[in-house]
Amino acid sequence: MAVRFFHTSDWHLGQFFYNHSRQYEHEQFLAWLLEQISARQPNALLIAGDIFDVINPASSAQKQLYQFLADAHARAPHMQTLMIAGNHDSGYRIEQVEPLLAKYNAKAVGVIHKNSQQQIDLEHLLVPILDEQQNTVAWCLSLPFLRPAEITGFNEHTTNSQNAIAYLHQQLIAEAKARKTADQALILMSHAHMQGGETSDSERPIVIGNEEALSTALFDEIIDYVALGHLHKPQKVGEEHIRYS
């Protein structure tokens, strides 16, 4: 089964550039994106973090997002919009409107949760992507910006940030492998600075466990596509299928 998806990131809705609002630019981008959705009818739209520019976005920025989701759903009702929190976002804020998002076939993964066994809730991070007939054509492994307080302290494998990041990737990929069938794709969406990624002047530095850049070795070869956010430049990182939008 084939899966069609759009990979976007770093919208930074509500951003001001030297005290000038970028709302008009965002309006033009979202209008263009709606045209692409209408024309191509993807199975999923991925937003790989930094949806908003600040943790507490203005009401106008939130309205811009929710109006876009409503318009996108009207043009492609079958399309799922999958979002993760970036370092500019409040993960809890983007998750708390889940009932509203569900109306527009959208889902946000903002934080790493614990399950009833006080372990990492992998179910929350593993999202099926469906086709028009509601068949699962892919799984999206959704990893928001990883804050040390959310990923450490689960067990002996998560005593520090670097170990916790490796453990989280291993556990999530193993769970995805167990669920997927031969004709289903695996897409990993993450908001992170990867080693080998080319930066620009517009990103805010992010530091995890005193080591900012992560290794692409975290991504198992079974992953078909890695949809990255954070670096504001479309690029491949090492492999053809590991990309920033």
Go through each PLM region and give its residues.
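Extended recognition/assembly regions associated with phosphoester-bond processing machinery
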Residues: 1-47, 51-245
